Protein backbone atom coordinates (compact mmCIF):
# COMPACT_ATOMS: atom_id res chain seq x y z
CA UNK A 1 0.00 0.00 0.00
CA UNK A 2 1.46 3.34 -1.02
CA UNK A 3 2.27 5.90 1.65
CA UNK A 4 -0.05 8.85 1.88
CA UNK A 5 1.07 11.63 -0.51
CA UNK A 6 2.00 14.92 1.06
CA UNK A 7 -0.85 17.41 0.99
CA UNK A 8 -0.30 20.82 -0.61
CA UNK A 9 -0.62 23.92 1.53
CA UNK A 10 -3.48 26.39 1.17
CA UNK A 11 -2.71 28.57 -1.87
CA UNK A 12 -3.07 32.20 -2.63
CA UNK A 13 -5.37 32.79 -5.62
CA UNK A 14 -2.56 32.90 -8.25
CA UNK A 15 -1.36 29.46 -7.12
CA UNK A 16 -4.64 27.70 -7.81
CA UNK A 17 -3.47 26.18 -11.10
CA UNK A 18 -0.46 24.56 -9.49
CA UNK A 19 -2.59 23.38 -6.57
CA UNK A 20 -5.08 21.75 -8.93
CA UNK A 21 -2.23 20.03 -10.74
CA UNK A 22 -1.01 18.57 -7.45
CA UNK A 23 -4.51 17.47 -6.48
CA UNK A 24 -5.04 15.93 -9.93
CA UNK A 25 -1.94 13.80 -9.47
CA UNK A 26 -3.16 12.74 -6.05
CA UNK A 27 -6.59 11.86 -7.43
CA UNK A 28 -4.98 9.48 -9.91
CA UNK A 29 -3.41 7.58 -7.01
CA UNK A 30 -6.38 7.83 -4.64
CA UNK A 31 -9.60 9.73 -5.50
CA UNK A 32 -10.27 10.23 -1.80
CA UNK A 33 -7.15 12.35 -1.19
CA UNK A 34 -8.39 15.61 -2.78
CA UNK A 35 -11.69 15.24 -0.91
CA UNK A 36 -9.90 14.66 2.39
CA UNK A 37 -7.77 17.72 1.67
CA UNK A 38 -10.89 19.80 1.02
CA UNK A 39 -12.39 18.76 4.38
CA UNK A 40 -9.35 20.20 6.12
CA UNK A 41 -9.24 23.46 4.15
CA UNK A 42 -12.82 24.42 3.27
CA UNK A 43 -13.01 27.05 6.02
CA UNK A 44 -10.39 29.11 4.16
CA UNK A 45 -12.35 31.81 2.27
CA UNK A 46 -9.43 32.54 -0.09
CA UNK A 47 -9.28 28.90 -1.11
CA UNK A 48 -13.02 28.66 -1.70
CA UNK A 49 -12.96 31.82 -3.80
CA UNK A 50 -10.03 30.50 -5.82
CA UNK A 51 -11.75 27.17 -6.44
CA UNK A 52 -14.92 28.94 -7.57
CA UNK A 53 -12.89 30.82 -10.12
CA UNK A 54 -11.13 27.72 -11.42
CA UNK A 55 -12.07 26.33 -14.79
CA UNK A 56 -14.84 23.74 -14.64
CA UNK A 57 -12.97 21.90 -17.40
CA UNK A 58 -10.37 20.80 -14.84
CA UNK A 59 -11.80 17.49 -13.53
CA UNK A 60 -10.44 17.80 -10.00
CA UNK A 61 -11.88 21.33 -9.67
CA UNK A 62 -15.31 20.01 -10.63
CA UNK A 63 -14.99 17.14 -8.14
CA UNK A 64 -14.04 19.54 -5.33
CA UNK A 65 -16.93 21.85 -6.22
CA UNK A 66 -19.39 18.95 -6.04
CA UNK A 67 -18.04 17.70 -2.72
CA UNK A 68 -18.03 21.16 -1.16
CA UNK A 69 -21.74 21.43 -1.95
CA UNK A 70 -22.33 18.04 -0.31
CA UNK A 71 -20.42 19.12 2.80
CA UNK A 72 -22.45 22.32 2.88
CA UNK A 73 -25.62 20.20 2.74
CA UNK A 74 -26.75 22.12 -0.35
CA UNK A 75 -27.97 18.85 -1.79
CA UNK A 76 -30.11 20.19 -4.63
CA UNK A 77 -27.17 22.17 -6.00
CA UNK A 78 -24.85 19.21 -5.33
CA UNK A 79 -27.09 16.87 -7.34
CA UNK A 80 -27.17 19.28 -10.29
CA UNK A 81 -23.39 19.79 -10.12
CA UNK A 82 -22.68 16.05 -10.04
CA UNK A 83 -24.84 15.49 -13.13
CA UNK A 84 -23.34 18.49 -14.92
CA UNK A 85 -19.77 17.32 -14.37
CA UNK A 86 -20.37 13.59 -14.81
CA UNK A 87 -17.75 12.14 -17.16
CA UNK A 88 -18.55 9.25 -19.52
CA UNK A 89 -15.16 7.67 -18.84
CA UNK A 90 -14.60 7.05 -15.13
CA UNK A 91 -11.75 4.58 -14.63
CA UNK A 92 -11.08 5.87 -11.10
CA UNK A 93 -14.78 5.60 -10.15
CA UNK A 94 -14.83 9.24 -9.05
CA UNK A 95 -18.42 9.60 -10.27
CA UNK A 96 -19.43 6.58 -8.19
CA UNK A 97 -17.63 7.98 -5.14
CA UNK A 98 -19.43 11.32 -5.43
CA UNK A 99 -22.75 9.54 -5.94
CA UNK A 100 -22.14 7.47 -2.80
CA UNK A 101 -21.26 10.53 -0.73
CA UNK A 102 -24.29 12.37 -2.11
CA UNK A 103 -26.74 9.58 -1.24
CA UNK A 104 -25.16 9.23 2.21
CA UNK A 105 -25.81 12.94 2.79
CA UNK A 106 -29.39 12.38 1.61
CA UNK A 107 -29.64 9.52 4.14
CA UNK A 108 -30.40 7.04 1.36
CA UNK A 109 -28.09 4.59 3.05
CA UNK A 110 -28.91 1.55 0.93
CA UNK A 111 -27.92 3.22 -2.35
CA UNK A 112 -24.95 4.94 -0.71
CA UNK A 113 -23.57 1.69 0.71
CA UNK A 114 -23.89 -0.12 -2.63
CA UNK A 115 -21.91 2.63 -4.34
CA UNK A 116 -19.24 2.97 -1.65
CA UNK A 117 -18.71 -0.79 -1.53
CA UNK A 118 -17.93 -0.69 -5.24
CA UNK A 119 -15.44 2.14 -4.79
CA UNK A 120 -13.71 0.72 -1.72
CA UNK A 121 -13.20 -2.58 -3.54
CA UNK A 122 -11.48 -0.64 -6.34
CA UNK A 123 -9.39 1.51 -3.95
CA UNK A 124 -8.57 -0.69 -0.97
CA UNK A 125 -5.68 1.57 0.05
CA UNK A 126 -7.82 4.71 0.41
CA UNK A 127 -8.21 5.68 4.06
CA UNK A 128 -10.76 8.36 3.13
CA UNK A 129 -13.06 5.90 1.34
CA UNK A 130 -12.83 3.35 4.16
CA UNK A 131 -13.67 6.08 6.67
CA UNK A 132 -16.73 7.13 4.68
CA UNK A 133 -17.87 3.53 4.36
CA UNK A 134 -17.55 2.87 8.10
CA UNK A 135 -19.14 6.21 8.99
CA UNK A 136 -22.09 5.36 6.77
CA UNK A 137 -22.53 2.08 8.66
CA UNK A 138 -22.52 4.01 11.95
CA UNK A 139 -25.05 6.57 10.75
CA UNK A 140 -27.32 3.95 9.19
CA UNK A 141 -27.20 1.54 12.13
CA UNK A 142 -25.54 -1.16 9.99
CA UNK A 143 -23.32 -2.16 12.89
CA UNK A 144 -22.75 -5.83 12.04
CA UNK A 145 -21.96 -5.00 8.42
CA UNK A 146 -19.73 -2.15 9.56
CA UNK A 147 -17.80 -4.49 11.85
CA UNK A 148 -17.20 -6.85 8.91
CA UNK A 149 -15.89 -3.96 6.83
CA UNK A 150 -13.75 -2.69 9.71
CA UNK A 151 -12.14 -6.10 10.09
CA UNK A 152 -11.34 -6.13 6.36
CA UNK A 153 -9.89 -2.62 6.52
CA UNK A 154 -7.74 -3.04 9.62
CA UNK A 155 -6.35 -6.34 8.31
CA UNK A 156 -4.83 -4.63 5.26
CA UNK A 157 -1.08 -4.18 5.43
CA UNK A 158 0.58 -0.83 4.92
CA UNK A 159 -1.43 1.43 7.19
CA UNK A 160 0.66 3.89 9.17
CA UNK A 161 0.01 4.53 12.86
CA UNK A 162 -2.19 7.56 12.18
CA UNK A 163 -4.31 5.68 9.63
CA UNK A 164 -4.72 2.68 11.93
CA UNK A 165 -5.76 5.02 14.73
CA UNK A 166 -8.40 6.67 12.54
CA UNK A 167 -9.82 3.29 11.54
CA UNK A 168 -9.83 2.12 15.16
CA UNK A 169 -11.84 5.18 16.18
CA UNK A 170 -14.62 4.00 13.88
CA UNK A 171 -14.18 0.33 14.71
CA UNK A 172 -14.49 0.85 18.46
CA UNK A 173 -17.66 2.90 17.91
CA UNK A 174 -19.18 0.13 15.77
CA UNK A 175 -18.47 -2.53 18.39
CA UNK A 176 -19.85 -0.36 21.21
CA UNK A 177 -23.08 0.43 19.36
CA UNK A 178 -23.43 -3.29 18.64
CA UNK A 179 -23.17 -3.86 22.44
CA UNK A 180 -19.80 -5.62 22.04
CA UNK A 181 -18.24 -3.51 24.76
CA UNK A 182 -15.36 -5.84 25.59
CA UNK A 183 -14.10 -5.65 22.02
CA UNK A 184 -14.62 -1.87 21.93
CA UNK A 185 -12.46 -1.55 25.07
CA UNK A 186 -9.75 -3.75 23.55
CA UNK A 187 -9.58 -1.49 20.49
CA UNK A 188 -9.41 1.62 22.67
CA UNK A 189 -6.45 0.12 24.52
CA UNK A 190 -4.73 -0.49 21.19
CA UNK A 191 -5.38 3.16 20.33
CA UNK A 192 -3.73 4.28 23.56
CA UNK A 193 -0.68 2.19 22.70
CA UNK A 194 -0.56 3.84 19.27
CA UNK A 195 -0.89 7.29 20.82
CA UNK A 196 2.29 6.72 22.80
CA UNK A 197 4.15 6.11 19.52
CA UNK A 198 3.07 9.49 18.12
CA UNK A 199 4.33 12.97 18.96
CA UNK A 200 2.52 14.56 21.92
CA UNK A 201 -0.48 16.69 21.01
CA UNK A 202 -0.64 20.37 21.86
CA UNK A 203 -3.62 21.27 24.06
CA UNK A 204 -6.56 21.94 21.76
CA UNK A 205 -7.89 25.48 21.71
CA UNK A 206 -11.32 25.89 23.24
CA UNK A 207 -14.00 25.62 20.59
CA UNK A 208 -15.63 28.87 19.56
CA UNK A 209 -18.68 27.03 18.21
CA UNK A 210 -20.59 27.14 21.51
CA UNK A 211 -23.40 29.68 21.43
CA UNK A 212 -25.19 30.30 24.73
CA UNK A 213 -28.14 32.07 23.08
CA UNK A 214 -28.78 29.18 20.68
CA UNK A 215 -28.40 26.62 23.45
CA UNK A 216 -30.92 28.51 25.58
CA UNK A 217 -33.26 28.66 22.58
CA UNK A 218 -32.92 24.89 22.16
CA UNK A 219 -33.70 24.29 25.84
CA UNK A 220 -36.82 26.44 25.93
CA UNK A 221 -38.04 24.96 22.62
CA UNK A 222 -37.90 21.32 23.74
CA UNK A 223 -39.33 22.10 27.18
CA UNK A 224 -42.22 24.11 25.71
CA UNK A 225 -42.92 21.38 23.14
CA UNK A 226 -43.16 18.57 25.69
CA UNK A 227 -45.03 20.67 28.24
CA UNK A 228 -47.54 21.44 25.51
CA UNK A 229 -48.33 17.71 25.47
CA UNK A 230 -48.89 17.53 29.22
CA UNK A 231 -45.42 16.34 30.23
CA UNK A 232 -43.11 17.74 32.92
CA UNK A 233 -39.62 17.88 31.38
CA UNK A 234 -36.93 19.37 33.59
CA UNK A 235 -33.22 20.24 33.35
CA UNK A 236 -30.92 17.55 34.70
CA UNK A 237 -27.20 16.76 34.92
CA UNK A 238 -24.99 19.50 33.44
CA UNK A 239 -27.91 21.71 32.46
CA UNK A 240 -29.28 21.71 36.02
CA UNK A 241 -25.75 22.22 37.35
CA UNK A 242 -25.39 25.35 35.21
CA UNK A 243 -28.73 26.70 36.44
CA UNK A 244 -28.04 26.08 40.13
CA UNK A 245 -24.32 26.96 40.27
CA UNK A 246 -23.86 29.61 37.60
CA UNK A 247 -27.40 30.80 36.96
CA UNK A 248 -26.71 30.13 33.27
CA UNK A 249 -25.99 27.32 30.86
CA UNK A 250 -22.42 26.12 31.33
CA UNK A 251 -20.17 27.48 28.61
CA UNK A 252 -18.34 24.16 28.28
CA UNK A 253 -21.43 21.94 28.13
CA UNK A 254 -21.54 19.99 24.89
CA UNK A 255 -25.27 19.29 24.91
CA UNK A 256 -28.53 19.83 26.78
CA UNK A 257 -29.73 17.40 29.42
CA UNK A 258 -33.50 17.14 29.93
CA UNK A 259 -35.27 14.48 32.00
CA UNK A 260 -38.74 13.02 32.48
CA UNK A 261 -40.25 11.48 35.61
CA UNK A 262 -41.52 7.85 35.52
CA UNK A 263 -45.10 9.01 35.01
CA UNK A 264 -44.22 10.49 31.63
CA UNK A 265 -43.51 8.35 28.56
CA UNK A 266 -40.15 8.57 26.83
CA UNK A 267 -41.59 6.68 23.84
CA UNK A 268 -44.31 9.32 23.47
CA UNK A 269 -41.76 12.11 23.86
CA UNK A 270 -39.68 10.54 21.06
CA UNK A 271 -42.71 10.45 18.77
CA UNK A 272 -43.62 14.05 19.59
CA UNK A 273 -40.11 15.32 18.86
CA UNK A 274 -39.57 13.31 15.68
CA UNK A 275 -42.92 14.51 14.35
CA UNK A 276 -41.34 17.97 14.22
CA UNK A 277 -39.17 18.85 11.23
CA UNK A 278 -36.92 20.61 13.72
CA UNK A 279 -35.61 17.39 15.33
CA UNK A 280 -33.90 14.29 14.03
CA UNK A 281 -32.61 11.30 15.96
CA UNK A 282 -28.91 11.88 16.49
CA UNK A 283 -26.78 9.36 14.58
CA UNK A 284 -24.34 7.12 16.39
CA UNK A 285 -26.23 7.14 19.69
CA UNK A 286 -26.67 4.02 21.81
CA UNK A 287 -30.08 2.36 21.68
CA UNK A 288 -31.45 2.62 25.23
CA UNK A 289 -34.83 2.21 26.92
CA UNK A 290 -34.27 5.28 29.08
CA UNK A 291 -32.31 7.64 26.85
CA UNK A 292 -32.76 9.29 23.46
CA UNK A 293 -30.53 11.77 21.70
CA UNK A 294 -31.84 14.36 19.25
CA UNK A 295 -30.29 16.97 17.00
CA UNK A 296 -32.03 20.36 16.82
CA UNK A 297 -31.68 21.51 13.19
CA UNK A 298 -32.61 25.11 14.05
CA UNK A 299 -29.98 25.71 16.74
CA UNK A 300 -27.51 22.93 15.80
CA UNK A 301 -27.63 21.78 19.45
CA UNK A 302 -27.77 18.17 20.67
CA UNK A 303 -30.50 17.34 23.20
CA UNK A 304 -30.18 14.34 25.53
CA UNK A 305 -33.58 13.23 26.82
CA UNK A 306 -33.54 10.78 29.74
CA UNK A 307 -36.26 9.13 31.78
CA UNK A 308 -36.19 8.26 35.45
CA UNK A 309 -37.69 4.90 36.38
CA UNK A 310 -38.93 3.30 39.59
CA UNK A 311 -36.15 1.35 41.33
CA UNK A 312 -37.69 0.27 44.62
CA UNK A 313 -37.10 2.95 47.24
CA UNK A 314 -34.98 4.91 44.74
CA UNK A 315 -35.37 6.38 41.29
CA UNK A 316 -33.21 4.92 38.55
CA UNK A 317 -31.50 7.10 35.93
CA UNK A 318 -29.00 6.57 33.15
CA UNK A 319 -28.68 4.36 30.08
CA UNK A 320 -30.90 1.30 30.52
CA UNK A 321 -30.01 -1.16 27.76
CA UNK A 322 -32.65 -3.42 26.21
CA UNK A 323 -33.18 -7.14 26.70
CA UNK A 324 -30.20 -9.36 27.34
CA UNK A 325 -27.83 -6.37 27.48
CA UNK A 326 -29.54 -4.82 30.53
CA UNK A 327 -26.83 -6.05 32.92
CA UNK A 328 -24.36 -3.78 31.09
CA UNK A 329 -26.44 -0.63 31.65
CA UNK A 330 -25.15 2.56 33.25
CA UNK A 331 -27.44 3.02 36.27
CA UNK A 332 -27.48 5.81 38.85
CA UNK A 333 -29.78 5.75 41.88
CA UNK A 334 -31.35 8.90 43.32
CA UNK A 335 -33.36 9.43 46.47
CA UNK A 336 -36.96 10.00 45.46
CA UNK A 337 -37.92 13.61 44.79
CA UNK A 338 -40.80 15.72 43.55
CA UNK A 339 -40.81 18.54 41.01
CA UNK A 340 -41.42 22.22 41.70
CA UNK A 341 -42.10 25.09 39.31
CA UNK A 342 -39.40 27.77 39.28
CA UNK A 343 -38.10 30.67 37.18
CA UNK A 344 -34.78 30.77 35.36
CA UNK A 345 -33.83 33.78 33.26
CA UNK A 346 -37.46 34.78 32.82
CA UNK A 347 -38.69 31.33 31.79
CA UNK A 348 -40.64 28.82 33.88
CA UNK A 349 -39.22 25.31 34.31
CA UNK A 350 -39.84 22.27 36.43
CA UNK A 351 -36.93 21.33 38.68
CA UNK A 352 -36.19 18.81 41.49
CA UNK A 353 -37.55 20.01 44.82
CA UNK A 354 -34.05 19.85 46.38
CA UNK A 355 -31.49 20.64 43.65
CA UNK A 356 -28.63 20.77 46.17
CA UNK A 357 -29.22 17.18 47.23
CA UNK A 358 -29.87 16.05 43.66
CA UNK A 359 -26.58 17.51 42.42
CA UNK A 360 -24.62 16.22 45.43
CA UNK A 361 -25.77 12.68 44.67
CA UNK A 362 -24.63 13.09 41.07
CA UNK A 363 -21.46 15.17 41.40
CA UNK A 364 -20.34 15.13 45.02
CA UNK A 365 -18.90 18.58 45.90
CA UNK A 366 -20.46 20.34 42.93
CA UNK A 367 -20.26 23.98 44.05
CA UNK A 368 -16.61 24.33 43.01
CA UNK A 369 -15.98 23.64 39.29
CA UNK A 370 -13.73 20.65 38.63
CA UNK A 371 -12.50 20.65 35.01
CA UNK A 372 -11.19 17.08 35.39
CA UNK A 373 -14.33 15.51 36.84
CA UNK A 374 -15.23 12.12 35.34
CA UNK A 375 -18.94 12.52 34.71
CA UNK A 376 -19.30 8.92 33.53
CA UNK A 377 -17.67 6.64 36.12
CA UNK A 378 -16.79 9.26 38.73
CA UNK A 379 -20.34 10.00 39.85
CA UNK A 380 -20.99 8.97 43.48
CA UNK A 381 -24.32 7.26 42.80
CA UNK A 382 -23.12 4.96 39.99
CA UNK A 383 -24.34 1.46 40.83
CA UNK A 384 -21.77 -0.61 38.93
CA UNK A 385 -18.77 -0.24 36.64
CA UNK A 386 -20.22 -2.23 33.75
CA UNK A 387 -18.42 -2.86 30.48
CA UNK A 388 -20.53 -0.16 28.84
CA UNK A 389 -19.45 2.40 31.44
CA UNK A 390 -15.85 1.26 31.12
CA UNK A 391 -16.02 1.57 27.33
CA UNK A 392 -17.40 5.10 27.65
CA UNK A 393 -14.55 6.12 29.97
CA UNK A 394 -12.04 4.71 27.49
CA UNK A 395 -13.72 6.76 24.74
CA UNK A 396 -13.18 9.89 26.81
CA UNK A 397 -9.61 8.88 27.67
CA UNK A 398 -8.61 8.41 24.03
CA UNK A 399 -10.28 11.71 23.13
CA UNK A 400 -8.46 13.60 25.90
CA UNK A 401 -5.08 12.18 24.89
CA UNK A 402 -5.75 13.05 21.23
CA UNK A 403 -6.63 16.65 22.13
CA UNK A 404 -3.69 17.14 24.48
CA UNK A 405 -5.90 17.36 27.58
CA UNK A 406 -3.48 15.31 29.64
CA UNK A 407 -4.66 16.42 33.09
CA UNK A 408 -8.19 15.17 32.38
CA UNK A 409 -6.71 11.98 30.88
CA UNK A 410 -4.84 11.35 34.15
CA UNK A 411 -8.08 11.78 36.10
CA UNK A 412 -9.81 9.24 33.86
CA UNK A 413 -7.02 6.71 34.42
CA UNK A 414 -7.44 7.19 38.18
CA UNK A 415 -11.16 6.59 37.75
CA UNK A 416 -10.56 3.36 35.82
CA UNK A 417 -8.09 2.15 38.44
CA UNK A 418 -10.51 2.99 41.23
CA UNK A 419 -12.84 0.50 39.55
CA UNK A 420 -10.15 -2.22 39.44
CA UNK A 421 -8.98 -1.78 35.85
CA UNK A 422 -5.28 -2.62 36.08
CA UNK A 423 -4.56 -3.18 32.39
CA UNK A 424 -0.82 -2.62 31.66
CA UNK A 425 -1.51 0.00 28.97
CA UNK A 426 -2.93 2.30 31.66
CA UNK A 427 0.33 2.14 33.62
CA UNK A 428 2.39 2.92 30.53
CA UNK A 429 0.01 5.71 29.55
CA UNK A 430 0.22 7.21 33.04
CA UNK A 431 4.03 7.43 32.80
CA UNK A 432 3.76 8.91 29.30
CA UNK A 433 1.20 11.48 30.45
CA UNK A 434 3.27 12.56 33.47
CA UNK A 435 6.28 13.15 31.25
CA UNK A 436 4.30 15.19 28.73
CA UNK A 437 2.41 17.11 31.41
CA UNK A 438 5.79 18.36 32.63
CA UNK A 439 6.65 19.41 29.08
CA UNK A 440 3.32 21.26 28.75
CA UNK A 441 4.18 23.20 31.91
Model feature map: region roles:
Residues 69, 103, 137, 174-175, ...:
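Residue at a conserved register position within TPR or TPR-like alpha-solenoid repeats
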Residues 55-56, 89-91, 123-124, 158, ...:
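Short coil turns that delineate tetratricopeptide repeat
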Residues 223-256, 263:
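Active-site nucleotide-donor binding segment shared across nucleotidyl transfer reactions
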Residues 208-223, 227, 273-352, 357-361, ...:
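Conserved catalytic core of two-metal-ion nucleotidyltransferases
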Residues 22, 65, 99, 133, ...:
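Structural register within alpha-helical repeat arrays
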Residues 139, 147, 160-165, 169, ...:
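Helical scaffold of the NTase/Pol beta-like nucleotidyltransferase catalytic core
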Amino acid sequence: MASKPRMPMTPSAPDISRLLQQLSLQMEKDPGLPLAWLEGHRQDPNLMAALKGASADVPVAAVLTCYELILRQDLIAAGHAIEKHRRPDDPLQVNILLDGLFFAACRDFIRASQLLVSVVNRHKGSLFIWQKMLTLCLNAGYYSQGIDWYQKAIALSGWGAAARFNLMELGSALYALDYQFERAIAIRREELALQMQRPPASPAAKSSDFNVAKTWQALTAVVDLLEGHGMRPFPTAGTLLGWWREGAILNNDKDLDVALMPADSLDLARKIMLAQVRYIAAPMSLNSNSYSCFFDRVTQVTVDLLQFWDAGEKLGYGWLLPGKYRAQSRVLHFDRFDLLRDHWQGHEFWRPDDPDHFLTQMYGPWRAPDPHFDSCAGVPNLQAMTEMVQATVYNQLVSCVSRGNYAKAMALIVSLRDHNDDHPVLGRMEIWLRKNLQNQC
